[in-house]
């Protein structure tokens, strides 16, 4: 009797994991297609930190590649920054176990940061710049055409509010960008993925997670406050997070105040410039009492063998 109960439980867990994986595959596949992140013949360098996000990114990309209508290569790269207590064996052992090409880059950025930054000050800014430079260099050495990072939808929304609250900018994380020197293209294939989905997936797949607090730096309190704010909104107002993410995909420049984005000076009597969307000078916009975008992913049953649509390069 107990064996039957365990069997049914295992079946349910397997079914739920299958649904979750297909949802993540669909979201990643859609992001890749919408922003033309990966093209035929690309060599994608997946930056692997040992956290849940980068593990999930690598796993889903490897899974998608099996049925993709284009060919692309994947190489995983980890930057060992020589932080005290960093378990150097975990990532090589894991990457060997899944038979993926990989490179471990050892650079003592930890020592440099500790030398340059006074005790008690945040080290994140300098550490980030050093890490970025090393990863760009490594991509060039490996012949990688794309650099894939594990930032997800929640990261992008948090960054949007951080820039509004503390930077005075309407700016988020782009799903795809080019480096200042024009030599590297960075992509974020998890852009449409929810953090809670990634957390569940990482637990179910039993990824060997490496703690993210080894450097001993102060936590980013501003980001944590914004994260908690968004989580509270998500609990109190279901659908609000999805609507906000939809908003950063539907920008109306003529109804903001950035004269660099929209030329307000060319507005003249008798002429309607392109890009203006509706006259609401005296009218208040009417909104639905509930968010227009509702997340239905939890209710979706995916078709077995579902194909993900990539944009193939001619």
Swiss-Prot record:
Alphabetical GO biological process terms: tRNA thio-modification
Sequence motif: PP-loop motif, positions: 49-54
Gene Ontology CC terms: cytoplasm
Pathway assigned in UniProt: tRNA modification
Chief subcellular location: cytoplasm
Subcellular localization(s) per the UniProt record: Cytoplasm
Cofactor(s) recorded in Swiss-Prot or TrEMBL: Mg(2+); [4Fe-4S] cluster
Residues bound to [4Fe-4S] cluster: 124, 127, 215
Cofactor binding note of this UniProt entry: Binds 1 [4Fe-4S] cluster per subunit. The cluster is chelated by three Cys residues, the fourth Fe has a free coordination site that may bind a sulfur atom transferred from the persulfide of IscS.
Reaction it catalyzes: cytidine(32) in tRNA + S-sulfanyl-L-cysteinyl-[cysteine desulfurase] + AH2 + ATP = 2-thiocytidine(32) in tRNA + L-cysteinyl-[cysteine desulfurase] + A + AMP + diphosphate + H(+)
Note: The thiolation reaction likely consists of two steps: a first activation step by ATP to form an adenylated intermediate of the target base of tRNA, and a second nucleophilic substitution step of the sulfur (S) atom supplied by the hydrosulfide attached to the Fe-S cluster.
Task performed by this protein: Catalyzes the ATP-dependent 2-thiolation of cytidine in position 32 of tRNA, to form 2-thiocytidine (s(2)C32). The sulfur atoms are provided by the cysteine/cysteine desulfurase (IscS) system.
Identification of the protein by name: tRNA-cytidine(32) 2-sulfurtransferase
Origin species: Histophilus somni (strain 129Pt) (Haemophilus somnus)
Classification lineage: Bacteria, Pseudomonadati, Pseudomonadota, Gammaproteobacteria, Pasteurellales
Gene assigned in the entry: ttcA
